[in-house]
Amino acid sequence: GEGVRSYDAGEIWHLLDTRYKIPISKLDVGDLSYIDLSRYSHIILPDYSEGSQYQADGGGINVDQIKNYIKNGGNLIAYRNSVKWVSNNLSEIEFHTNEINADNVNFSERQNFYGAQQTGGAIFNSKIDKSHPINYGIESNYLPLFRNSNVYMTKSKQSFNNPIVYSSNPLMSGYISEENLSLLEISTPFKVIRSGKGKILLMTDNTNFRAFWFGTNRILLNMLFHSNIM
């Protein structure tokens, strides 16, 4: 639908339909009100463009319909900026935010100033709890993650609710500003929110990047097949 990033939607589609032969339904967010969602075990919200209609006023999505779907046992998976949509419409989430102010930056340099705070694509190391269902099948205690967003969720106070955390000195490749790196180090890329009989599963990093970042594909599959025990 309008505002959904086609790259992200296509990456998810390719992974499930082409690589794993799992049939999916591609639904326009504006058409959900006309669809019986009880047919589906999971709904996946890909990333969206900030400032799009998808971000505002529920983005044309019938929010009550989604709430009822989850409470009755459905599962919602939200990626990257869609995590913000969940926070605005379904369940409040705490975020760390970059509050940097321009100091000695003139008007002609403003685009470079803001551009330096964007994380266009970088690789970060994470430490995982292999006993948690989100990490089933991963043999190492560490998992490199591909990140191209500036969404930083706060960690849970209960350590067992943080099955994926960034390691110390997490930057492995790419660029991130010092300000955002400090936020990343105290954030978690994954959360589970329980609501009624269902769950909301949140992921701020891209587990399916361009059909070659295979190491984290298992994260999405575990959200699909093991959400009932998370």
Model-predicted segments: where are they?
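Helical hinge/lid and interdomain linker segments adjacent to catalytic or ligand-binding clefts
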Residues: 2-94, 210
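Generic recognition of flexible, low-complexity loop/linker segments
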Residues: 13, 29-34, 64-66, 112-113, ...
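Extracellular ligand-binding/catalytic regions of CAZymes and related secreted enzymes
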Residues: 18, 22, 133, 139, ...
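Conserved beta-strand scaffold positions in the cores of enzyme catalytic domains, especially
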Residues: 24-26, 76, 123, 163, ...
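C-terminal, active-site-flanking charged/polar segments
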Residues: 44, 75-77, 95-97, 217-229
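A glycine-rich, often tryptophan-bearing local segment used as a flexible ligand/cofactor-contacting loop or short
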Residues: 55-140
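Extended, composition-driven regions rather than compact fold-specific motifs
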Residues: 91-93, 97-98, 155, 192-195
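Metal-dependent peptidase/peptidase-like ectodomains
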Residues: 127-164
